[in-house]
Structure formats: structure tokens, C-alpha cells
Curated annotation (Swiss-Prot):
Pfam families: Aldedh. Coiled coil: none annotated. It catalyses: N-succinyl-L-glutamate 5-semialdehyde + NAD(+) + H2O = N-succinyl-L-glutamate + NADH + 2 H(+). It comes from the Bacteria. The keyword Calcium does not apply. SUPFAM superfamilies: ALDH-like (SSF53720). Signal peptide: none annotated. It is an enzyme of class 1 (oxidoreductase). Pathway: Amino-acid degradation; L-arginine degradation via AST pathway; L-glutamate and succinate from L-arginine: step 4/5. This is N-succinylglutamate 5-semialdehyde dehydrogenase. Belongs to the aldehyde dehydrogenase family. AstD subfamily. Its EC number is 1.2.1.71.
């Protein structure tokens, strides 16, 4: 029984699915997808649970969410192992994901009060009050790269705001989704407040097409995000929050400390085997001897990165990709760029055929025409050389995406210029592109999102504002508007 609907664990009636470890091939999870009728049942359960959940005092909702945080801490080792085995990422990185999930609770509570709490302004004849109300029933679509943390970034603020939810994890990480939901069950969520439906495209389409949804919160690829946007077009009454990918530039302008710059680049491009939406995909390096030395050192150090199993001891910096098919897609993207005229500086290599272990690749594309403006979700870094800083900014902005952008430079003025001219939701200076703070918004422009950033701003799309003018009693104004006459006439 792998679906959780209205507080009950039930068996899916859709397609049979199994999840294997992307490196060892071990079967980790088996179950059936939710069919359309079960998806509708989950929505009905969420709708029925909404009035009571929304009317709960905030403190009552907060108490359950905080109990979930306690359970996450108590089961940190177990959840770390599930995430590591299911995604292929090393245990150390899976552990940081669970820590991020735990930290999200306190941050989301603070954000709720800061972004969507109650504010009151006293007036001469009463008060003006701002309150916030939950949308109702929301669908949450989770990604596979952070199958615990990223859905958590939607689920926690949505529950705090008083919404009820239907959660569909990625079909590539059903085990993590189920494990997290079992912790929510133990935290004491009332039946129907949070529902789990497993499945792939058909389940997702059934969920996103439900008439009774009040909104959809999505993290994933641009192609799926665009599809959801088209599907919900003409329905302005539904909130749609899209967090999509990027073709992110990292500008290397000043590399006086070459090893520090190389370390920052490795963290930006290859952490999580390149499977973070903020990962650097395009490396822009200034022409000249300093840039040459930086690239040579980058190729040298990156060439020593050996992806390992999730359970290796000592642990590796990167593990496997989410699947052998994902690794093959990266290889095909590299070969495509070579065919266009790219010069390979470091060839990616499959460590073992049939697994998702893939070494990093670096290819120079300076002067190459018609390079696809796409997000290759893996450890492939494209290099362009530039002559002056204005050209670097032009190259950085030469993308339909706008998620993250970074600069390595000792010149504050260059960073100030980048802040003014970059089209990206995250712009970092001498920090990895993959570094983000939950106390700040997280999102992008262009094909990277629809202006609904998450993290600190997630509270914004989980509730709508209600403005009120209030007075405890009704009195006739001392001064009337022109043309109004309230004088009493004598009876004839």
C-alpha cells in the first residue's frame, strides 16, 4: 500500500512501478501508481478536510509542523539512507538534505509571520487590518534531485497557512516521498490534510487537470513547467508557482587565488553530480594567461573527481546521477557539442556501463554557433572565453533562463554592474552558484519561473491577502459629502 489518501494507506490501481538504486540496480521500492479516480479521491479528501484545518488556530497547525521537525531529527539517519540509496548521492550530501528539511520548519514559521501575518493600523474612526487566508486545496509536484527538501519547501509553508494538499513525488523518488509522508502521519496530521499519490505522467496530468484544485506548486524542468502553465491557462483563479531550471553562467574575471576559484567552480558545476537547478552550466573565463592557468588547473582537479557509490568509505564528492538514462543524456549532449565544433577539455566518462556513475566533462564552445540554450542536468560544463567585462555580461544574459549567475572578482564595482545588468533571481559574488539561503527568496526570471520565488517568499504563494476597514460601532459622520441631506422633515 503506497498511497495515503484521507488518512488511509491504500494500493494504487494504476501502472505497476518499481524503483532501483541507480548504481547497484537493487530494487528499493515497488508499488502501483494512483489512477485518475484515486487522484480525484485524494482531492475530495483534501477539500473535505480544508474548512476545519483552515479554522484551526495557527498555534495548532504550528504544533503539528514542529512535531514533524522532531520526527525528522529522530529519524535523520533512516531518511538519509533512503535519500542516498534512491538518488545515488553520497551519504554526506543526503544528510545535509535532511538537515535542510529540519531547518525549514523554524524558517517557515518566521516567514509566515513576516510575509503573511496580521497587521493592524489604527485610524481615527476605527482600524485597517491586513490578514491572510489559505487558498484551499493545493497540488505539490516534487522533483527527484532533492526529493525531501524541495517538496518540503512547498508543503511546510502551505500547511502552516492552512491549506490542504495532494503531494505527487517524482516517479524517480517514490520511496523518499513515502518515507516523508509516514513521518507526517506520525506527527498527527488530521485525515485528508495531506495526501500522497504516486505515479508518473498520467498521474500528474490527472492531478493538474482537476477542476477542484485551487493551485499547483511545482519544482522541476522547464519543459514540464511550460506544459503545466499551458494546462492552467485561462484559470486565473488558481495560484501556480513554478520553480524551474537554468542555464546558469559563472564569470571568472579575477583569479589571483587559482585554487580558490577552482574550488568555487567545482562546487558550482559538479556538486550533486551537476543535478542542482542552480548549477553552473556556462563558465565564462577572461582571455589571457591568468584565464589559461585557471582552466588548466580546473581540468586537472576536475579530472581527479571519481564518482562513487552512496555507501563508499571514504565518501566521494559526487555520486551517481538519478538514473543510467540521465547519464546517457549527458553523454549525448557532450557529443552534440563536439559535433557543433566544441573543443573537449575533459571528456566525461561512464565509470561502469549500465550505472549512473559519470565523471565530469568540460568543453570549450568559444565561437561555436547554434549551441542549444538548454539545461543539461548533469556534470557537463560549457566554457566560453571573453575579452572584456561587458562582453561577459552579454554572454551571461544570452539565455532564455534566469535562475542564477555568479562572479569571481576582487572588484566590487564589477559586482555592482552585474547586479544592475544581470537577468537572474540569484546573483552571487565570490560564492558558489549552488549556495542559497532559506532566509532569502529562491527563484528566477525568464524560463526559470513565473515570479513565484520559494524559500523565504514561499509564504506569499501559500496565502492571499484580505484587507479590512473596521469599526466597533456605526455612527453618522460629522461632515457629510456634498449633496447629502439627513435633516429630518416635519410631518405635514
Amino acid at each position: 500500500m503506497t498511497l495515503w489518501i484521507n488518512g488511509d494507506w491504500i494500493t494504487g490501481q494504476g501502472e505497476r512501478r518499481r524503483k532501483t538504486n541507480p548504481v547497484s540496480g537493487e530494487i528499493l521500492w515497488q508499488g502501483n501508481d494512483a489512477n485518475a479516480a484515486q487522484v480525484a479521491e485524494a482531492c475530495q479528501a483534501a477539500r473535505a478536510a480544508f474548512p476545519r484545518w483552515a479554522r484551526q488556530p495557527f498555534a495548532a497547525r504550528q504544533a503539528i509542523v514542529e512535531k514533524f521537525a522532531v520526527l525528522l531529527e529522530a529519524h535523520k539517519a533512516e531518511l538519509t539512507e533512503v535519500i542516498a540509496r534512491e538518488t545515488g548521492k553520497p551519504r554526506w550530501e543526503a544528510a545535509t538534505e535532511v538537515t535542510a528539511m529540519i531547518n525549514k520548519i523554524a524558517i517557515s514559521i518566521k516567514a509566515y509571520h513576516a510575509r503573511t501575518g496580521e497587521q493592524k493600523s489604527e485610524l481615527v474612526d476605527g482600524a485597517a487590518t491586513l490578514r491572510h487566508r489559505p487558498h484551499g486545496v493545493l497540488a505539490v509536484f516534487g522533483p527527484y534531485n532533492f526529493p525531501g527538501h524541495l517538496p518540503n519547501g512547498h508543503i511546510v509553508p502551505a500547511l502552516l497557512a492552512g491549506n490542504t494538499l495532494i503531494f505527487k513525488p517524482s516517479e524517480l523518488t517514490p520511496w523518499t516521498g513515502e518515507t516523508v509522508i509516514k513521518l507526517w502521519e506520525r506527527a498527527g496530521l488530521p485525515a485528508g490534510v495531506l495526501n500522497l499519490v504516486q505515479g508518473g505522467r498520467e498521474t500528474g496530468q490527472a492531478l493538474s487537470s482537476l477542476d477542484d484544485l485551487d493551485g499547483l506548486l511545482f519544482t522541476g524542468s522547464a519543459s514540464t513547467g511550460y506544459q503545466l502553465h499551458r494546462q492552467l491557462s485561462g484559470q486565473p483563479e488558481k495560484i501556480l508557482a513554478l520553480e524551474m531550471g537554468g542555464n546558469n553562467p559563472l564569470i571568472i574575471e579575477d583569479v589571483a587565488n587559482i585554487d580558490a576559484a577552482v574550488h568555487l567552480t567545482l562546487q558550482s558545476a559538479f556538486i550533486t553530480a551537476g543535478q542542482r537547478c542552480t548549477c553552473a552550466r556556462r563558465l565564462l573565463v577572461k582571455q589571457g594567461a591568468q584565464g589559461d592557468a585557471f582552466l588548466a588547473r580546473l581540468v586537472d582537479v576536475a579530472g581527479r573527481l571519481q564518482p562513487g557509490r552512496w555507501d563508499d568509505d571514504p565518501q566521494s564528492f559526487i555520486g551517481g546521477l538519478i538514473s543510467a538514462q540521465a547519464a546517457q543524456h549527458v553523454m549525448e549532449a557532450w557529443r552534440q557539442r563536439e559535433a557543433l565544433g566544441g573543443r573537449t577539455l575533459l571528456a566525461p566518462r561512464k565509470v561502469k556501463e549500465g550505472t549512473s556513475l559519470l565523471t565530469p566533462g568540460i568543453i570549450e564552445l568559444t565561437g561555436v554557433a547554434d549551441v542549444p540554450d538548454e539545461e543539461v542536468f548533469g556534470p557537463l560544463l560549457n566554457v566560453w572565453r571573453y575579452a572584456h567585462f561587458d562582453e561577459a555580461i552579454r554572454l551571461a544574459n544570452n539565455t532564455r533562463f534566469g535562475l542564477s549567475c555568479g562572479l569571481v572578482s576582487t572588484d566590487r564595482a564589477q559586482f555592482e554592474q552585474l547586479l544592475l545588468e544581470a537577468r537572474a533571481g540569484i546573483v552571487n559574488w565570490n560564492k558558489p552558484l549552488t549556495g542559497a539561503a532559506s532566509t532569502a527568496p529562491f527563484g528566477g526570471v525568464g524560463a526559470s519561473g513565473n515570479h513565484r520565488p520559494s524559500a523565504w517568499y514561499a509564504a506569499d504563494y501559500c496565502a492571499w491577502p484580505m484587507a479590512s476597514l473596521e469599526s466597533p460601532e456605526l455612527t453618522l459622520p460629522a461632515t457629510l459629502s456634498p449633496g447629502l441631506d439627513f435633516s429630518r422633515r416635519e410631518a405635514v
